[in-house]
């Protein structure tokens, strides 16, 4: 009997919840990215939504990449979000490195033209062994490039750039006189601050928040 009562109570609680539509930010099209149940609008705030980048851009070559959004508020049953980062799946990175011989990791905080800060993590994989001098030159060139690029763009434009198609060709161009690299990926980005508002560097829910993964 106790089990039946608990089950009934759970069903009643579920019925009391409302379906909310979660949208990407305006700078990524204000697209409906998922739906989720919530007790009220306040219960939705700070939840994190994970979305395949291919769903946002239509580029299915990016099926290994996920964007992360944090819900900032709701208007009725529509939830608004901000972009807080993205990442490439670890399995893809491991396969990438296994097929080649050298890996270089670059991590840099980039400040955009409107004062936002985002941590950018780049992975470089070469087909052959690199000298320490070459590695240093590649790191320096890519760090200089991504910092300069970010400083020229607003946060919204830089987000579109990070998950778009142009970054790869631009990074290859930035290093072509050092070594003919064939694989350079922005493997992860993490929002540090946006318009003076501090954001957690880890892609985890804030206290009381809940992660939502899109199926």
UniProtKB/Swiss-Prot annotation:
GO terms for cellular component: ribonucleoprotein complex; ribosome. It comes from the Archaea. It holds the Pfam family Ribosomal_S3Ae. Keywords: Ribonucleoprotein, Ribosomal protein. SMART domains: Ribosomal_S3Ae (SM01397). GO terms for biological process: translation. Residues 195-215 are annotated as: Disordered. GO terms for molecular function: structural constituent of ribosome. InterPro entries: Ribosomal_eS1, Ribosomal_eS1_arc. Belongs to the eukaryotic ribosomal protein eS1 family. This is Small ribosomal subunit protein eS1. The lineage of its organism: Archaea, Methanobacteriati, Thermoplasmatota, Thermoplasmata, Thermoplasmatales.
